[in-house]
């Protein structure tokens, strides 16, 4: 084990573009469904829908947060609709399935998506049995990362001491609140859209291109 991480008791992972590669393109499918949902909601064309979608994403952290605030959208209806995508692009990751159980302590998923979708993805990757808990958008009170409130709820819910916790995420802005709480942070810099938005070097302890490669280096030795 990397000596810089021997104090870590709780390992927290983002889901999309973190536990699977951004190159999978899965979020592009969700993006398309979000656009279609907004077209139906507002009766607008695809160009306007895309503009609205991205504005909400940039201003509120997620498209859903903006739609709830400005258009009183039901979160359950929205999430069920946009996550109704095929998951064939997501491949089973046997290596990740071997590495995660070797991490000392507990493992959690912290996602701006919802739990049903997250469980489907984790099943596809082959790692659904390796996590003690899942903290989704409903659990944050619909205040998505990087809103600090969701991180505080995560820690309170599972009894996590930030000083002994690590968060891996593909978006720097989501690491900033974690670092402020005292967590160790890992930026999975693998090409996510706006992954470097709000870049703050002092909020990043480790910068890695591939989560599996990094975990192999961290754990070292043989299984």
Language-model segment annotations:
Residues 21, 109-111, 187:
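Hydrophobic residues in well-ordered beta-strands that form the structural core
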Residues 17, 109-112, 169:
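Conserved residues at beta->alpha junctions
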Residues 92, 110, 143:
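Residue-level marker of regulatory loop/turn positions in helix-turn-helix DNA-binding domains and
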Residues 3-13, 18-97, 101, 116:
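N-terminal helical cap/lid subdomain that shapes the substrate entry/recognition surface
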Residues 44, 73, 105, 160, ...:
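Short glycine/serine/threonine/alanine-rich loop segments
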Residues 1-9, 97, 101, 114-115, ...:
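Asp-based, Mg2+/Mn2+-dependent phosphohydrolase catalytic module
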Residues 100-108:
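Internal catalytic-core helix/loop-beta-alpha segment
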